[in-house]
Amino acid sequence: MGRGRVQLKRIENKINRQVTFSKRRSGLLKKAHEISVLCDAEVALVIFSSKGKLFEYSTDSCMEKILERYDRYLYSDKQLVGRDISQSENWVLEHAKLKARVEVLEKNKRNFMGEDLDSLSLKELQSLEHQLHAAIKSIRSRKNQAMFESISALQKKDKVLQDHNNALLKKIKEREKNTVHQEVQLIQCSNNSSILQPQYCLTSSRDGFVGRVEGENEGASSLAEPNSLLPAWMLRPTTNE
């Protein structure tokens, strides 16, 4: 007795539904890959689970290329059928195209982040690895360039500061030199004035006090008249009481 025809309907049990989805999805992806390889056909397969998770397959990982070809074909077909497509329908088509591209880009982004890799074939994984290596190489090159530019800028700032410090040191030394020179001149002027200025002293004699002028030569002295050097009251002879 042969098997009866199984009626297709929604599986009510959540676990059984998930298991069936996983098995059928793998089989569908496998069939898509087989027809692509055996028949040299360009195949694009997009599957969304009940939770909104995306699963896809495309020949040689060219989903965007196949979708663009599909859009061109669809647009050309509509042009042949009739050119009375309204503007709103054009916007709907453009929206669908952009939405498909966004979904593909989001899928690629997740793949680059190391997510949703189970659905990728070996060839797709190798292509993804190559793209990541190229991206890392480009990032490392830009990082090294940025570090070099930063070091060069710091060296320029250091040179400017060094030149500024040298200029300040030069000014300080010049001011110190001028200060020392002025102090030496002041000392010399002070010494010269003390040598040239006459010194007076009083000496006593039998008749009273007389003045004596001391000049540069201390050995030579001249006596002055008492009344010409000192007032009269200071020249009166003292008396012993």
UniProtKB/Swiss-Prot annotation:
Keywords: DNA-binding, Nucleus, Transcription, Transcription regulation. InterPro entries: MADS-box/MEF2_TF, MEF2-like_N, TF_Kbox, TF_MADSbox, TF_MADSbox_sf. Residues 3-57 form the MADS-box domain. CDD domains: MADS_MEF2_like. GO terms for cellular component: nucleus. Residues 88-178 form the K-box domain. It is found in: Nucleus. GO terms for biological process: positive regulation of transcription by RNA polymerase II. Gene3D superfamilies: Transcription factor, MADS-box (3.40.1810.10). Its main location: nucleus. One of its GO terms (molecular function) is protein dimerization activity. Probable transcription factor. This is Agamous-like MADS-box protein AGL8 homolog.
